[in-house]
Amino acid sequence: MIDRVRLPLTVKVLIALADLKGKVGNSARRKLLRRLRKRSLLDFEQRLATLGPRDVCIDLGANMGVVTEKLAATGAEVHAYEPDPYCFDLLTKRFADKENVHLHNQAVSATAGSLLLQRTRDFEIDPEIQSQSSSIIRSNDAIYDPEKSIKVEVVAFNDVIRDLHRYVALIKMDIEGSEFEILDCILDDYANGCVLPIGALFIETHERHMPNRFDLVKSVRKATWSGLLPYRIDTYWP
């Protein structure tokens, strides 16, 4: 177990109000999101300061490599996963001289296999921006063009962790919907007595696009704040 997360009284009040319906609940959720996103970024920077060459980090959904760059600057061994070939080509050039950065042209989800990576209809207009929305999960969203989808390899999250044979100090996860399946997997494993060698996870969750997953995110947040999980899972990564 980890220590309980100490939340300011104002945040605790907003958490309680966020469960309400109507304008009060909507307002509380917006305020809570703003506050805890700032807190998430601060916590991330503080954890970066503790990393060094002996540590291992993972960037899931590396995209253009902004976070990968920050992780690599600590001297830690960084494994960056990015399924989109456009982004991966840029990552390959950006980190060509970084011996501590290992790039993987794969998507990560709960199970291994192959899936179609959906690209937006406007991908060619501005691929650097549009690639941030590429997803192997959100196929029914109107912003995607089925004709622009590409087949990508998917590796299982648990395999990624176990194949390293190392403790993973920090994971950043921004994978456009696949995070829910991974969270399900993490919680199921823990319920069955399996604790992965992980320190902290910073996850951007996309329940606004998948409302049926809101309860999962809510339960993960409460479990983390209460110190009931062996990992620090921050689901307010912006």
Q: Where in this protein do the model-derived segments appear?
A:
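Phosphate/nucleotide-binding beta-alpha loop and adjacent structural elements of enzyme active sites
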Residues: 2-238
